[in-house]
Amino acid sequence: MKVHVKAFATFREVMDNQVDMEFTEGATLRTLLAGLTGRYGGLNELMFATPDTLRDFVNILKNGRNVHFLSGLDTQLENGDVIALFPPIAGG
């Protein structure tokens, strides 16, 4: 299956703006992130507080829905999904 990934803000500085990735059936968001952090070394430090915990305020959307309200890192991926990666953003 093919999944389209879009990166925003500081995530774009360490990876391509958009990338298509292919997975076998049963892949999860955790699988996708492992592939991305393996390909783009600096992404792991920006995204994860611990190996199994995203940094606070990192937002990941699957087809426009925050994965926090789905199954988190265990959210199942499906063919054609669009995953958007947003780092913490602060303003003042």
Predicted regions and their residues:
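Ubiquitin-like/PB1-type beta-grasp interaction modules and other compact soluble beta-rich domains
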Residues: M1-G91
